[in-house]
């Protein structure tokens, strides 16, 4: 699933190419693409037609288009393989095209989704701590690249939990936008094993992890995000290349860039974690062991 840098790359592309345009028509080509919009396809198409796209916004991994003159946003769920492509209408239809919106600018906004886990849905905007967000996103915490992200407050929240530090990083109600890739990269930079317990880490250590997450995601942004296959692309269909700069994630058995020790892969929350056993020694007591 795309993480903050990948979603931000898409947001910036949408901001550049479609903000200010109005929607002339909408074609729903697959029912699963609008399953989160409970009133159905005709309602979604009807509400979008004639609306002007005022802005492209994001919080963490969540992306939405603010519409005018209403107080409604089009929430875009990218899922595992969703793509928001801006294309000239004469280009051939993509094999997995699910929704097509024709804009008055002469361009198409196309939602392509091979695995059909993503989709579009309308949601009312609500005020949360001085920011307007879709009500479906209201429970999501600010992300590390948000100008109003409160690092000190987030450190306090993390340390107030009794859980593994990686699990806390992945909790979108604590800090949003960080997924498996950037959690592993941030922990590697901070030299902390993901199974370390949050209430046993010092404030400076938690701050170091969160700062590392900020740094690695900013670097990923400059390289268009991380693409491991053709499913993640920007609005022009181009892949990112930060995967070439990863130090831990996906690097099993390769030498740690810092000390040369082979990177190790471990199971964590039905996924894999990657770390250096020398730079990031595992804790003697994990959460599972301490609860026995």
Swiss-Prot record:
Family the entry assigns: Belongs to the FPG family.
Q: What is this protein called?
A: Formamidopyrimidine-DNA glycosylase
Lineage here is: Bacteria, Bacillati, Actinomycetota, Actinomycetes, Mycobacteriales
Q: Which PROSITE patterns does the entry mention?
A: FPG_CAT, ZF_FPG_2
Recorded catalytic reaction(s): these are: Hydrolysis of DNA containing ring-opened 7-methylguanine residues, releasing 2,6-diamino-4-hydroxy-5-(N-methyl)formamidopyrimidine; 2'-deoxyribonucleotide-(2'-deoxyribose 5'-phosphate)-2'-deoxyribonucleotide-DNA = a 3'-end 2'-deoxyribonucleotide-(2,3-dehydro-2,3-deoxyribose 5'-phosphate)-DNA + a 5'-end 5'-phospho-2'-deoxyribonucleoside-DNA + H(+)
Cystine links in this protein are: none
Its quaternary structure? Answer: Monomer.
Q: What is its EC number?
A: 3.2.2.23, 4.2.99.18
What detail does the entry give on cofactor binding?
Binds 1 zinc ion per subunit.
Tell me the name of the encoding gene.
Answer: mutM
